[in-house]
């Protein structure tokens, strides 16, 4: 049973602050973050590779309006260029992952990634160490994090 149920946000913040300052938490944090970043990178790589498995249509664009035709040609070219950048980022992240998962995670992070990282951290702390930890989003419900 979670001993923090029914506590105010201020009490939960104090709990987290105390937890994060504890020697035990400080001792395990590097290992936890290694695992968080490793899992994050693996998840993002899997998502990106699924995206890359979809092919950009190569069939001719049939439209009487030359502006529409040019728009779709440009869109295709942009998608192909983005895919090349995506492939490069994936390869770089794969190279970094065994020795520097934090750098690999930074390379693949985008808007909203903090929520995924926090969820992983929360889960790992709970499952592996039995520690209840609250994310910044949980402790600051009126703040929008990206």
Where does each model-flagged region fall?
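Extended, non-membrane alpha-helical segments enriched in charged/polar residues
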Residues: 10, 14-17, 34, 38
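Acidic, low-complexity, intrinsically disordered interaction modules
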Residues: 36-91, 98-128, 132-135
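Charged, low-complexity interaction regions
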Residues: 18-29, 97-99
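Short amphipathic alpha-helical heptad-repeat segments
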Residues: 2-12
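Short acidic DE-rich linear segments
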Residues: 144-146
């Amino acid at each position: 049973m979670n001993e923090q149920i029914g506590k105010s946000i201020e009490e939960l913040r104090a709990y987290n602050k105390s937890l994060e300052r504890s020697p035990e938490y400080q001792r395990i944090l590097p290992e936890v973050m290694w695992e968080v970043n490793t899992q994050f990178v693996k998840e993002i790589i899997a998502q990106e590779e699924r995206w890359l498995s979809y092919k950009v249509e190569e069939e001719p664009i049939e439209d009487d309006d030359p502006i529409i035709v040019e728009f779709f040609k440009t869109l295709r070219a942009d998608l192909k260029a983005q895919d090349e950048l995506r492939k490069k980022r994936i390869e770089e992240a794969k190279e970094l992952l065994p020795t520097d998962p934090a750098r690999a995670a930074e390379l693949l992070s985008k808007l909203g990634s903090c929520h995924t990282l926090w969820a992983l951290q929360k889960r790992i702390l709970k499952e592996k160490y039995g520690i209840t930890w609250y994310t910044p989003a949980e402790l600051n419900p009126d703040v929008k994090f990206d």
